């Protein structure tokens, strides 16, 4: 049982083979950094709420939006759930991974895309930190 996913209520997740998902991502998403060993994955088993921990099947760290699109396409085709994570600093458990899922880490997306000082708005990528 996971704090975020209860099979009795949400339905069973399909059983997936780590190696099959790893090979499909390597084949369809060139240049993607994929973490798959326990040593690599352990730091991603929780966010800032460290009371709850779940190791994901794989952790992927894309550098380009095209890679994100390809990751989601592969995971959809293989019926593998995806949890998206920024810097992992949240304290609500919103980025806790699923044991049978891929953790999509968006920490490399830090750009400011647009600033509208008149409208007091900014459009930024997911891991852009505010500077006051």
Residue ranges of model-derived segments:
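Noncatalytic alpha-helical scaffold of FAD-dependent oxidoreductases
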Residues: 1-85, 90-132
């Amino acid at each position: 049982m996971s704090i975020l996913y209860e099979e009795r209520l949400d339905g069973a997740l399909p059983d997936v083979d780590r190696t099959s998902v790893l090979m499909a991502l390597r084949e369809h998403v060139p240049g993607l950094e994929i973490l798959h060993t326990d040593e690599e994955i352990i730091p991603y088993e929780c966010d800032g709420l460290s009371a709850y921990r779940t190791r994901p099947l794989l952790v992927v760290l894309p550098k380009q939006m095209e890679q994100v699109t390809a990751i989601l396409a592969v995971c959809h085709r293989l019926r593998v759930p995806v949890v998206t994570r920024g810097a992992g600093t949240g304290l609500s458990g919103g980025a806790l991974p699923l044991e049978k899922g891929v953790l999509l880490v968006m920490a490399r997306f830090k750009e400011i895309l647009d600033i509208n000082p008149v409208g007091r708005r900014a459009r930024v990528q997911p891991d852009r930190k505010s500077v006051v």
